[in-house]
């Protein structure tokens, strides 16, 4: 590390008033759809309907940003509008650093966000760089320009609740209720997911503005005045067999321990506060939000200490629920790790959601496949919904999800859809969407992407790769290989990030997006990318010894030299 202590901070702006919104229709701002697509999706990430704090470039997840600062944002936009189809833009932690001649089948944008040499991969070091304007936290889909609002995690949360219901309650959540906290960009999916799974939910959130937004977008049904009111509503609705979501404004570190003291018994307990980032994402008990934000600047070490201590009380309450026989699980925000660091030695006694409920899906390459209509026309999404049902006719669970999504999910920004499908299905759907663009059935191209939370694209020992069968939880070669393969296969843009979901030092992960513009060239790229991308997930799990993945690899004809030798 350099010993030069000179302040390297340059003139840059993190706050700017105004509204960013992606263009709609077929008129291009950039030269072709291959560059128009990343331009629109970048802007869509900052749409007020989508982003948590667009004036600060924050999309979701604490400080997950779409660009490092507004000067960088402007230069990214300028670069994309000028980019040719044989050039590639390089983005380093939200800053456009170079345009290079490549070729038409190469990605138009390559993105690396928040990556630090492992020894220095801590929030403390990252925050120093961030304060100097030398870094940006990209979360997962914030800095990779494929966030679609809370819908992006609704189905994954729904699948988790459904599987938990199958394991613990004979597949029936009617008359049951989920206790959780956090109504930000990710946590905001929980109330709707619980409702769709047939359960009531009590959702604690410390910011009233977030509750207001989730009620406005129909992710939350109603708000309780206080804990007594919330519990009365829960008792009423569960007795009636209704699946109603209830928000309660307060601090989970206060409310969960109080519920334990009262002997309240939820049917399921989890959490999706932004505990991964104690400096920016978790309000210490007894503090106001304004006090928290001000002291995060003036006393960062004290803020982190106070936030972690509150997390410890939160986790101790979750452990008490588990010890009372209530299914309790971590939903991927690293709150167990934070609590363990301040003395809760048994914080990991309750499992993460992936090993508990999701890993069998990952073994078959099934994960959060998503697409967005660049036209801005909801009819384009409804037509693709119908195409999914046509091409996957026998999956009643998937059809039910699509029907519920159309009925209950409000689009945020550009219309989009998510559905969990796997190896074989993704390429089939992508090629069909491309043909729909070619024929004019869709009014403009669509982009296909996914969360970085997928079967082959992440190493996260406290989340996606927790408790791997062979002990390879922390091996991060896999997301690097995924990014390299997607680049070689011709994805339109590819990203490689660090720290998403669980915070600095705890994850590495990659993403890809591909454009369906109706051309033959796009079809060739789609066939490669949408096969190879989920195939890396099957490969990764087969390599770890999972029989489901080994069988899937054989069924799909994957060439895995060390499997079945």
UniProtKB/Swiss-Prot annotation:
Pfam families: Urocanase, Urocanase_C, Urocanase_N
Keyword NAD: yes
Region (Disordered): 453-472
Catalytic activity entry: 4-imidazolone-5-propanoate = trans-urocanate + H2O
Molecular functions per Gene Ontology: urocanate hydratase activity
Compositionally biased tracts (Basic and acidic residues): 463-472
Listed name of the protein: Urocanate hydratase
Species of origin: Pseudomonas syringae pv. tomato (strain ATCC BAA-871 / DC3000)
Gene from which this protein is expressed: hutU
